[in-house]
Structures are given as C-alpha cells and as structure tokens.
C-alpha cells in the first residue's frame, strides 16, 4: 500500500517535475554592503551597525516586471524570492515586525510586486522564508552556530523565549500563505545541529501550510539540509519531510532515490557566481555553456535546477547575469523539448553528453 505522504507528494509535484528550470532571487539589506547575504554573520556585525542599511534601503530601480521578462526569456518556469532571509528583514508588509521594506525609504511591499509581475508572465511563484532570524530577541544568540553574536559574551546566559520566537515565525508564514494569493512553492531554510523538525514545531506548521494552501510545494529543510536530508529519502517520510530534496551547490552523482530505489523529486540550488546575495567584487560567473550543461545534467538525473541571481541594492540584476541568462534562453528556445517534461532516460550515459527522456 502506497504511503499517503508519498502519494500526495507525487501529486503535488507533477507540474514541478515538468518545469525543471527556475530562478532563485536573494535580495535584501545585505545588497547595500555588497559583501554577500551572510555579511552580518561572517563579520559578527552588531544589530546597530546593520541597522544603517535599513535607513538607506530605497530600491529605487526595482522593477519586477523586468525581472519576470528576463526569467521568461531565459526559459525559467518558476521563480522564488527571499521574502525573509536570516537577517530577519522582511521584503513584505508583515504586521509582526517593524523591520520590513514598507518602513524603509523604499516604502514598498516588494513581495507583492514580485508575485504580480511573475504571475503576469505565466511563471509559477514561490517564496523563500528563513527559519533562522538574527533580528528576533528570542532567537538564540551566544553559542549558536551561525548567529552574528554567537561569540559575544554580553549574551552569555541570556534567557531566550524560543516558544515566543516560534509563534512569531509561524505567524509570519501564515501571513504569506493568507495575504499573498496562490503560492506554488514555499522554500524554507534551514535546519542545522538540533534545530530541525519538531524544534520548529514542524508538525503544527505543516498542518497550517496544508490547510491554507494544500497544493503548495515545499522543500525538505524543515527537517534536514545538505547531506542531512531528513526522512524524504525513506519509505516512511514525516508529514513535514517536504516535497523535494534540495542539494546545494552540487549535483548528486546518481540523482536522488529513496530506500527502495525510487526517484524522488529534487532540485539543485546553484549560484550564478559564488554568492547568493549581491557581492560587488564577485566576478566568478558561470558561463552560459556551463549553466546549460548543469541544467541538462540535472534533468538527466530526474532533477530540477534553480539558478540564483543577486540583485544590487537598487534592485538591478547585474548586467553579466542578464547576458548569461539571455544566452541560456536562446539555447532553450531551440532545445527546450529535451528539458521540459523530461527526466531520467534509463540509458547509460554516452561519452558525448547526456540523455533525457520525455515523460509519458
């Protein structure tokens, strides 16, 4: 008898496993210092120092219609935007915090505009939401693996009401699922150490997600990240195991299968250069040829590719990124039949490339 979680996962991901190619967009306050999205953690930056970027954020050239047209031209079938990253800054008008785009000089609900623009182009839409929040006072500070203040003795012995934080987190997710229309993907990030599964009250959370938007496809990072994928690879996955596995910056050598050897949905999330968020001096871009080869390899192994771009502080996707994506789109215009709706061909890999097969 088929496991109900697996059965529902298969039904939900039918469109997703045909789409194959998506756009990831990491954008937030960290685009202002322009040293990557982990700048606050990497530099142990105090909240007060980071706040100056909040006061500067105007996103004057943000035009999501241009982003959406670029994604369509590149042949991307879905797109995911960081509604909130680890720094806790919301690109939408959350009623649970003042740390949001509508309170910056920008004064815009950037998520709402993104969703409308991409829907208008016929592109499926998703939102990334960080389970981690370095802004919230009740998220663990001292001794945490990643928090900017993890080594700051001032926070040693500080009591944090983690249940209060979880209430805040769940409320914000409920906002996104309630106030922003039909979402195709919710991309949670991430679990680490003992911060996984029921530490996030994942059963309660997933019940809410499925009640509000039963169709929405979610990743596996409520339970595991990276090599610790969680129970999605087993024959008895938890209800919060996710609908797809999410290897980062790599392609699994043989794709991803469960314990019985059955293919499970997966998506390689890969950056176009070496950072997710905008980095002014990162010019290590992948060529369009390499992007195409990466996409073909993913599809040949029954997986998706979500390729990341990091807009600058004004809301502009770097020109180099635009040029690469347009070139990839030219290839897909001629060869998309070998990508969309295709997967593992059940044939040995040839010396000259890869096989894909259209799903019947």
Regions found by a protein language model. Name each.
Residues 1-360:
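Mature catalytic domains of secreted/periplasmic carbohydrate-active enzymes
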